[in-house]
Regions:
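Glycosyltransferase catalytic domains, chiefly GT-A lineage
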Residues: 2-463
Length: 463
């Protein structure tokens, strides 16, 4: 019979309890180690070493995106499998979509200007010309960048190379903020079918040549892995963010032979075969344009509020752009609208270059050129103005997060105008851009003083 201690507990009972505690201790220790390993895994995916540890950041073909240190803390990104077909070789490329709405689209390349005024890349679009450009007709002529002698000049060797490019994966690096990241899971068929074109400025080509291996082919073309580097000389804008909008939005102007294009931002590593992307997002649903829903915002007014809070552009100029849009009939997004959001994830754009899609791109760029360079603000406005003439696919954000790995910029981007709080501060400190955003300084043909922006309710603490 077991002896009992003073507390009335048998010695055998105490020994049994000590023995039972050991497995619990082992379980607790195992859980602690698992949490420690998980923390290291998440840290490694977000650290610079993720480039070398990328295998740890992927699972089952679904990509775990490393977080951007410039973004505010947020909940873990929701990812889902992309319903692509199994084999790129099995994809049947359909006939091109006929141009049924806008049959002929041409571009204004020379503006009326003072004799001593330099040409502007985006032109000197008047308020009347802007309004007329939204009236869709069978034949249209609009501003679309690339005014004569205004910059963004391409080397002859690159201009000749792109003549053959009908299927394009395009990206861009400006002001040395990134280095090219090699795409993964690219089939042999797509390697032969697609041109992978990395558009860079002179600052970036110098930075890239100093930090990665650049090979020069027999014709003088420069390559980093699969990427053909295309250097643009004479940047058209003072602000690097605006320069980056040229290849992003005006892909059809830079590469006019392209039938299809996929744009990805320079800090991204593409993880899905581009032919599978076109099949999933364009051909399967018979769309000509696809873009993902924004992870946090639906309304341009909520996006504008986030831009101001995060100091992504001068607050009074963001307010002015939104006041113009609100005055012109752009209501906050709600579930009754025909699109799931007015705000896209603009880092990935998937397009068939029909005339209506190219018109949309021109009008979108014109808004970016006229107002702030924050293209997510103007995207929904242009969609609103074009109405039912533009049918496109806004796909789930969880699929967007599975298309790529996101790498950090090589350094933080910031310009002084982004921190400005008042118009007098911008003027006094000489922060006004000289070649872009001129609509923010040109008298608007209506009184905006009584316009009050709609109240903004934050739907996400991370946004």
């Amino acid at each position: 019979m077991a002896r009992r201690g003073k507390g009335g507990v048998g010695v055998g009972d105490a020994a049994w309890r000590r023995g039972a505690a050991r497995p619990r201790l082992l379980v607790v220790s195992a859980v602690a180690w698992a949490l420690l390993l998980l923390a290291f895994h998440l840290w490694s995916c977000a650290s610079p070493s993720a480039y070398f540890l990328s295998a740890l950041c992927r699972k089952g073909g679904e990509v775990v995106r490393a977080s951007d240190p410039m973004e505010p803390p947020s909940k873990p990104l929701h990812r889902c499998s992309i319903p692509v077909v199994d084999d790129p070789d099995a994809v049947v490329i359909p006939k091109r979509t006929p141009n049924e709405i806008v049959k002929k689209l041409s571009y204004i390349t020379v503006d009326k200007r003072d004799k001593d005024s330099p040409p502007l890349f985006g032109g000197r679009q008047t308020w009347k010309q802007r309004e007329e450009s939204f009236k869709v007709n069978a034949t249209m002529k609009v501003h679309c960048g690339f005014m004569k002698n205004s910059g963004a000049d391409m080397d002859a060797v690159d201009a000749e190379y792109i003549q053959k490019c009908k299927f394009v994966v395009a990206s861009g690096i400006f002001d040395g903020y990134d280095i090219p990241h090699q795409p993964s899971n690219i089939s042999l068929r797509s390697q032969k079918l697609f041109c992978f074109l990395m558009v860079v400025d002179e600052v970036s080509i110098d930075f890239i040549e100093q930090n990665v291996t650049v090979k020069v082919d027999s014709e003088g073309g420069k390559w980093v892995g699969i990427w053909r580097l295309v250097t643009l000389h004479r940047p058209p804008f003072d602000e690097p963010r605006r320069n980056g909008k040229v290849p992003k939005i005006l892909t059809h102007r830079l590469f006019p032979q392209a039938w299809y294009s996929i744009w990805i931002d320079g800090k991204m590593e593409l993880m899905v075969d581009p032919l599978l992307i076109l099949e999933r997002y364009l051909w399967r649903g018979k769309y000509t344009f696809a873009v993902a829903v924004h992870k946090h915002h639906r309304s341009i007014y909520e996006e504008g509020d986030a831009i101001k809070r995060r100091k992504r552009y001068a607050r009074p100029l963001v307010d002015l752009q939104m006041k113009i849009y609100y005055h012109e009939g752009m209501e906050p997004w709600d579930a009754k609208k025909r699109t799931p959001s007015d705000i896209p994830e603009g880092a990935v754009l998937i397009r068939e270059h029909t005339t209506i899609v190219d018109l949309f791109s021109c009008l979108w760029f014109n808004e970016v050129n006229l107002f702030t360079p924050r293209d997510q603000l103007s995207f929904g406005y242009v969609v609103h103005r074009l109405g039912d003439t533009l049918k496109f696919f806004m796909f789930p954000n969880c699929e967007y997060n599975s298309l790529f790995i996101l790498h950090r910029h090589t350094r933080e981007h910031s310009s002084k105008v982004e921190w400005a709080k008042t118009i007098p501060e911008i003027v006094k400190n000489g922060l006004k851009e000289s070649r872009g955003g001129l609509g923010l300084w040109t008298p608007y043909p209506a009184d905006l003083s009584s316009v009050k922006l709609p109240a903004v309710k934050r739907t996400s603490q991370a946004g």
